[in-house]
């Protein structure tokens, strides 16, 4: 059982009374329709969504993962322990896309024992975060649907299941290649990858229906396996409810060597990203 989950269960069972801390639960954010798993108890403000809660939005949504017993996290990596009622956490800390791990621990008393806590936050990480925010504004991505609009069935498992067109505005001349990632952050078991491609030649338009082959000639790119276990694009096919599907474009300063999963691809481009842009669409299946 995860560290925070374990603390949460102890609290639910009546142990450690008087302590306030971040607990894990499942609730729906009315703002971005995300099923979030973070709840900040006590004076630190109640429920806070990973999209920013009261002030954030889908374009700022970042992922949180379950914490294991060592306190380590997956990518996006913000871990916040807020066990002391005298401490407050900010409603929103945005580390999305820099794939850095920042673990913030606060001092507390749990079941009569003091938990020593440390803040691990290198200045370079925060500098990278600021740079990332600026970079995120530099590309405009458009498609066959409006940002936040419904994805046409043509591009889903209920239709032709072909990739939608992507129009990219604002590319710099020194960009060497593009990376494409399409993912569903609302999947029941965590982020689900629908498409990854790298070494995409810099272009202002990626036409629809990219062939489902590893190597593509027009435009030139290399495609990896998605979470369906297939090469290339496979579209939205949510088991229930309305899901969000992000099409993320990274403009980088190099060509990549190797074969990658989504996580490996994100690690490979770290430190090489010149520009970034995204568009997301919504899709739910008729029952």
UniProtKB/Swiss-Prot annotation:
Pfam families: PBP (PF01161). Coiled coil: none annotated. Belongs to the UPF0098 family. NCBIfam families: YbhB/YbcL family Raf kinase inhibitor-like protein (TIGR00481). This is UPF0098 protein AF_1698.
């Amino acid at each position: 059982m995860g560290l925070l989950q374990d603390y949460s269960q102890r609290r639910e069972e009546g142990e450690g009374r008087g302590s306030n801390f971040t607990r894990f639960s499942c609730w729906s954010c009315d703002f971005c329709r995300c099923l979030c798993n973070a709840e900040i108890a006590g004076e630190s403000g109640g429920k806070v969504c990973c999209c920013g809660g009261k002030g954030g939005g889908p374009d700022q949504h970042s992922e949180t993962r379950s914490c294991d017993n060592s306190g380590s996290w997956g990518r996006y990596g913000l871990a916040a322990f807020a066990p002391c009622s005298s401490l407050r956490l900010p409603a929103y800390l945005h580390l999305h896309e820099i794939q850095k791990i920042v673990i913030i621990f606060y001092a507390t008393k749990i079941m009569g024992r003091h938990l020593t806590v440390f803040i691990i936050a290198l200045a370079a990480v925060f500098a990278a975060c600021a740079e990332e925010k600026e970079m995120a504004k530099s590309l405009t991505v458009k498609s066959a649907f409006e940002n936040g609009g419904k994805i046409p069935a043509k591009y889903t498992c209920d239709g032709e299941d072909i990739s939608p067109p992507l129009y990219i505005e604002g590319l710099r001349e020194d960009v060497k290649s593009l990376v494409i990632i399409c993912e569903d952050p609302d999947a029941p078991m965590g982020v689900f990858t629908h498409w990854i491609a790298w070494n995409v030649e810099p272009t202002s338009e990626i036409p629809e229906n990219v062939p489902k082959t590893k190597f593509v000639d027009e435009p030139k790119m290399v495609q990896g396996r998605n979470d369906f276990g297939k090469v290339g694009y496979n579209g939205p096919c949510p088991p229930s409810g309305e899901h969000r599907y992000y099409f993320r474009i990274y403009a980088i300063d190099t060509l990549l060597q190797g074969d990658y999963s989504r996580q490996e691809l994100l690690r490979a481009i770290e430190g090489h990203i010149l520009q970034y842009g995204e568009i997301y669409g919504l899709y739910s299946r008729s029952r």
